[in-house]
């Protein structure tokens, strides 16, 4: 009976081995360009930066702000490609 139990346990699905943490495409860009004011979790609020976890802006609104800036937020449209802007915006929407 012990052999059957061991065989059954061996055949059960095994959890995946932990690998290196997955980095989302916009995460590195966010770390480089946004963390100073928004913080790593989007909640820092330095220099008047909004808490990204409580923002009502959708992807379109965030794309506009990242590209053109507003108030104290600088425009990143000349520093980032449109694809990079989309990656940063997509990453910012994952912050909770």
Say what each PLM segment does:
Residues 23-27, 31, 39-67:
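Gly/Gly-Pro-rich "capping" loops immediately C-terminal to redox-active cysteine motifs
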Residues 66, 78-96:
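C-terminal capping alpha-helices of c-type cytochrome domains
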Residues 13-15:
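N-terminal signal peptide c-region/cleavage motif recognized by signal peptidases
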Residues 32-35, 71:
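Glycine-centered loop/turn positions within well-structured domains
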Residues 61-79:
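Short Fe-S-cluster ligation motifs
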Residues 1-8:
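Sec-dependent signal peptide recognition
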Residues 19, 43-44, 94-96:
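Inter-heme linker and motif-flanking segments adjacent to c-type heme-binding CXXCH motifs
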């Amino acid at each position: 009976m012990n052999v059957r139990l061991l065989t059954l346990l061996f055949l059960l699905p095994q959890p995946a081995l932990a690998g290196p943490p997955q980095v989302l495409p916009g995460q590195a860009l966010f770390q480089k360009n946004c963390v100073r004011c928004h913080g790593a979790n989007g909640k820092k609020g330095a220099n008047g930066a909004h808490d990204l976890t409580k923002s009502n802006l959708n992807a379109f609104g965030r794309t506009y702000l990242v590209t053109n800036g507003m108030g104290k937020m600088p425009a990143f449209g000349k520093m980032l490609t449109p694809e990079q802007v989309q990656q940063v915006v997509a990453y910012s929407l994952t912050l909770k």
